[in-house]
């Protein structure tokens, strides 16, 4: 990488921008030699590359393919360039598809392929973040500027974020309920004024051996409803319900409070690489905390409480749910929360095993796109919550 060679993108594009199929990639290469230099040429390459490694030890297999490579000459020499600043604009367009022969994989049962003519949709940019996994993957899109030199080229490389459009309403963004199956309880007594209070240490010890009639017990569990189709950056509401049948006894129940929470996406990635006799496959998992905080709000029994703000309002890039010929990405959702009662905390964990992360741009269109999907889903009376993103064929 050379310090006197840089890549800049035209507004509104930046390294954080999320490109989509057919988007223009506009920018410029800036060459800033500190002294006179002989330059053969200056060229720029726009390339999409797909790399996977699966298995371990002697069974490990690697696979890579260049989805596309577009090169342009920005300056043609040879020419002796004086110490100054030179700017060369470039323009590329993201392809919508690329040609690939899926027959290199001998088994399509895991990754069913609908594009038998060899035209594949571009998959979203993503990569394995750790070397400790048994498999690795990287789907990358990059702009590389280069000046050939006898003893090592000058170059500068910038990676771009890319995600395809979602074109089908499956799954629709309907919420789904789930609950922590564990039962929790609190023992308490009522004061002379009828106010619940925790048992003292001595009362708790005696209760273990013999139940006292003035002691009360309340059993409770937590249920939650959350969206199963998600765009990071859209402010979804989560509905919490503290469940208990003991309030029907007529005794005064203690007050509960929902305090700390963690909202986590459970990312699951299946990676494969072809071999001579067998295709190697690896499964990777990672937990991504998308929201956490402290709410400190009263949680009524058997009545839903709608909580806003758990999902982040500022979008960040994450690969959407997708299935391609060598990488498959899916998600689950997990909510961890703390419920406090009479000075004691209970930890809850609620899990939705399958949610879908929608692709969306970071700058605009998230709210409009989701409202359109929600409206269309209601009109069509859709309630299917399975499936993966569909791409234009």
Task: Annotate each predicted stretch with a short phrase.
Residues 1-393:
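C-terminal beta-sandwich interaction modules and adjacent acidic
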């Amino acid at each position: 990488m050379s310090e006197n060679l840089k890549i800049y993108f035209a507004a509104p594009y930046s390294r954080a921008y999320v490109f989509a199929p057919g988007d223009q990639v506009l920018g410029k290469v800036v060459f800033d030699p500190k002294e006179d230099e002989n330059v053969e040429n200056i060229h720029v390459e726009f390339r999409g590359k797909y790399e996977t490694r699966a298995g371990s030890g002697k069974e490990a297999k690697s696979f890579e393919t260049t989805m596309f490579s577009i090169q342009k000459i920005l300056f043609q020499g040879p020419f002796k360039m004086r110490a100054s600043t030179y700017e060369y604009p470039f323009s590329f367009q993201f392809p919508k598809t690329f040609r690939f022969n899926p027959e290199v994989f001998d088994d399509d049962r895991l990754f069913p392929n609908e594009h038998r003519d060899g035209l594949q949709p571009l998959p979203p940019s993503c990569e394995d973040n750790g070397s400790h996994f048994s498999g690795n993957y990287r789907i990358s899109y990059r702009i590389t500027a280069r000046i050939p030199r006898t003893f090592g080229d000058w170059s500068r490389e910038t990676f771009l974020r890319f995600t395809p459009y979602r074109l089908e309403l499956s799954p629709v963004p309907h919420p789904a309920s789930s609950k922590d199956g564990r039962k929790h309880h609190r023992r308490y007594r009522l004061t002379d004024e009828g106010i619940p209070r925790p048992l003292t240490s001595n009362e708790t010890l005696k209760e273990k051996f013999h139940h006292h009639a003035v002691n009360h017990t309340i059993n409770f569990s937590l249920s939650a409803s959350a969206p199963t189709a998600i765009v990071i950056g859209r402010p979804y509401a989560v509905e919490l319900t503290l469940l208990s049948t003991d309030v029907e006894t007529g005794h005064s129940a203690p007050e509960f409070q929902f305090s700390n929470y963690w909202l986590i996406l459970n990312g699951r990635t299946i990676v494969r690489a072809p071999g001579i006799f067998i295709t190697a496959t690896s499964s990777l998992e990672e937990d991504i905390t998308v929201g956490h905080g402290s709410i400190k709000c009263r949680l009524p029994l058997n009545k839903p409480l709608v909580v806003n703000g758990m999902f982040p309002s500022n979008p960040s890039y994450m690969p959407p749910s997708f299935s391609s010929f060598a990488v498959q990405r899916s998600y689950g959702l997990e909510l961890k929360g703390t419920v406090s009662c009479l000075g004691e905390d209970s930890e809850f964990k609620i899990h939705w095993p399958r949610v879908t992360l929608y692709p969306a741009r970071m700058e605009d269109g998230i709210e409009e796109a989701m409202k359109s999907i929600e409206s269309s889903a209601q009109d069509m009376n859709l309630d299917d919550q399975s499936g993966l993103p569909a791409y234009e064929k």
